[in-house]
Amino acid sequence: MAQNTAFFISNTRGKMPSALHGIFSAVQEFSLSMLCSAHCFTIFTQRVYLRRQTGKIYCMNNYLNQLQKTYQNDDDFTTRQVDCGMPLTLCFLDSMCSDIKISNYVVEPLTYGEKATDFECIKKRLTTGAIVKEPANFFDVLDVMSNGYTVIMDEQNCIAVDTRTTLARAIIEPPTSMVMRGPREGFIEDAKTNLTLIRKRLKTADLKVTTLNVGKYTNTTVFVCYLSSIAEKKVVDEVVQQVQKINIDGVLDASYLSRYIDKNKTALFRRVGMTEKPDVAVGKMLEGRVALIVDGSPMVLTVPYLYVEDLQSPGDYYEDNTMTSLNRILRFISVLASVLLPSLYVCLQMYNYQIIPLKFLITVLNSTQAIPFSPLAEMILIIVIFDILREANLRMPSAVGISLSLVGAIVLGDAAVKAGLIGAPAVMIGALSGIGLFTMPDNTLILSLLRLVITYIAGVMGILGVILSMMVILFYLCSMQEYHTPFLAPFTPTMDNDKQDAVLNKSLVSWKKRPKSIPNKNTTRRGQ
């Protein structure tokens, strides 16, 4: 239309009055400018269309400038110029990349042989022996560089080659999960190695992995692993949604993630399983649970989680089922004793001493008659001192920690009894209670807190306070539910099938059904 307007004006200019010549001249100039603009717009749209069709990224010099601005004052950011028939720029983070891999996977393929004529030739050379990605935008470039990739770019294209350095420690037995029999491999801080340890045990295409990134600055990789033929889809979706909703600067360990995927942030008892052993994680996945591998952490999270799992040990499934059952009963009794012994000692001395046999009562009275503190203050003092020694032992080196424990337990205890500050029965009760806590190491802190609270209530209300405290705790545990799983299953609600691996452990030969307390698609264990 602009061409027709200009042609019409040029042909009719001599036939018009002179007064209209100025107006038509202005219109002609406007039409010519519109013609030029239309031509330029056509070129622009053709270039945009070409970019969409070819997928190429133009103006790589702008990307290089943006990288230099982003990593300004960062000596770790490195650029190199390579000429292989066409000028190329290599960009990478020196601390994340291996010089040997850059030489073998990037520089040598580019400079070896004939000169490259185009970028497609460069791609073919680089893809023969390395993992290669093509960033779609500037944010993808930043992401691959942060993961140890080397970005190769010319004026119009870019490609990234995996040259990350390997910083993984040896696979050893976890110090917190040692066993007499069974596998001794443990997870390490590298997420891909941990995923390999799981895949080595689950050689099936049903093992699915969803990759997520968490943390504004750390951009930590999280692998959500599950068996698609066993795990319930609604549980998997809920776990993925909980991880995707996390908004935090950084995730440095799996314990960060456990606080976010636990829906009840104020729960006293943890409701997310944690393990350092691949065989334990695989065993839980075979029951329908979801495992989460966090890069940088040797701990793997598992959900849903049952309280009865605290009584189970990794070595239980490699021992005789009779011995396993006895050990679990012993753990259960130890936990109850560690929580209730101090409170029962206090209430029986202060309020309900008539329940104690006469000879035992006389012995206790002879040991405590010169003590300046009340039984409540005496027991709380012992509990606090024991917790201080335990915390100091954790913070000190192993050799010093052993000496500190011996000095604290023997020297201080003996000196306090001889000085008449505390009684020998109270020291014995406090020691038994403290040792019993370590039969359930994952809940030591919360059990220690409950022990202190119940002891105080026993000193105020007597045996009635102990009974009421245990009822409140039991009701609280019964009300807990996470990811469609009751926390106290298989006892409340009662599930007879699940009791084969609760406190008593039946033979593996009799395990025919998967736990009903864990949502799953396939209830049969025997390959069906």
Regions found by a protein language model. Give the residues of each.
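Membrane-embedded alpha-helical signal segments
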Residues: A2, A6, P17, H21, ...
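Membrane-interfacial loop-to-transmembrane-helix junctions in polytopic alpha-helical membrane proteins
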Residues: E319, M323-L326, S367, N393, ...
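Loop-to-transmembrane-helix entry motif
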Residues: M323-L340, S367, I371-P375, V407, ...
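Generic detector of multi-pass transmembrane helix bundles and their immediately adjacent loops
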Residues: L344, F360, Q369-Q528
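Membrane-interface interhelical connector segments
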Residues: M350-T368
